Amino acid sequence: MMEQGKDCREVVTQLAASRNAIDRAMGLIVSTNLEHCVRESLEKGEDTQNLVKEAVDLLVKSR
């Protein structure tokens, strides 16, 4: 876009849209994986607190 001489606002808008799409995809992937891991841990009688904390920490760190 920059090589095409697009306005700076257009470039920033596209970058923000890309970031938003990636953030949503990451959220979906992490939540799906977390759900699977929690179910598996519950079936084994294991504590799920650490799994949830790790998932939240990963999401926070990725921002």
From Swiss-Prot:
Disulfide-bonded cysteines: none
Originating gene: yrkD
Cellular compartments per GO CC: protein-DNA complex
A single MF term (Gene Ontology): metal ion binding
Protein name (database record): Uncharacterized protein YrkD
Segments crossing the lipid bilayer: none
Cross-referenced InterPro entries: Metal_Tscrpt_repr, Metal_Tscrpt_repr_sf
Superkingdom per UniProt: Bacteria
One example of a Gene Ontology biological process annotation: negative regulation of DNA-templated transcription
